[in-house]
C-alpha cells in the first residue's frame, strides 16, 4: 500500500531542521542522518547527506532524479561477495 496523499511524504523533523539551517547559513556541508526512511524532497536537491548503513555513514549527493525515493535506497546495507567458482585444477 502506498502512503495516503493527505498525509504527505515522510521526512524526519530533525532532518528538516538541519536542511533549513543549512539553507539559511548558505553552507554546503554534509548532513549526517540515521533516517533512512525519509523521502527525498525537491528542497534537498544539491545537498550531500551522510546516510548511516549500519556500519558507516555513506555520502549521498541528491540530484533531481532522486526526488520521491527514500534516502536508504542509496546507501546499501549489505556488501555483495561474488559467487566465485573454485578452480578444481589448481587444487591438485
UniProtKB/Swiss-Prot annotation:
Subcellular localization(s) per the UniProt record: Plastid, Chloroplast
GO biological process: ribosomal small subunit assembly; translation
MF terms in GO: rRNA binding; structural constituent of ribosome
UniProt KW rRNA-binding keyword: yes
GO annotation, cellular component aspect: chloroplast; mitochondrial small ribosomal subunit
Domain of life of the source: Eukaryota
Entries under Pfam families matching the protein: Ribosomal_S19 (PF00203)
Keyword RNA-binding part of the UniProt annotation: yes
Keywords: Chloroplast, Plastid, Ribonucleoprotein, Ribosomal protein, RNA-binding, rRNA-binding
Function: Protein S19 forms a complex with S13 that binds strongly to the 16S ribosomal RNA.
Family: Belongs to the universal ribosomal protein uS19 family.
PANTHER family from the UniProt entry: RIBOSOMAL PROTEIN S19P FAMILY MEMBER, SMALL RIBOSOMAL SUBUNIT PROTEIN US19M
Protein name in UniProt: Small ribosomal subunit protein uS19c
Species whose genome carries this gene: Emiliania huxleyi
Taxonomic classification: Eukaryota, Haptista, Haptophyta, Prymnesiophyceae, Isochrysidales
Amino acid at each position: 500500500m502506498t502512503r495516503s496523499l493527505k498525509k504527505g511524504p515522510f521526512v524526519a523533523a530533525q532532518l528538516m531542521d538541519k536542511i533549513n539551517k543549512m539553507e539559511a547559513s548558505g553552507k554546503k556541508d554534509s548532513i549526517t542522518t540515521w533516517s533512512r526512511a525519509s523521502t527525498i524532497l525537491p528542497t534537498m536537491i544539491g545537498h550531500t547527506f551522510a546516510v548511516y548503513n549500519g556500519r558507516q555513514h555513506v555520502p549521498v549527493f541528491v540530484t533531481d532524479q532522486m526526488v520521491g525515493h527514500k534516502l536508504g535506497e542509496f546507501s546499501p546495507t549489505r556488501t555483495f561477495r561474488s559467487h566465485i567458482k573454485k578452480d578444481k585444477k589448481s587444487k591438485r
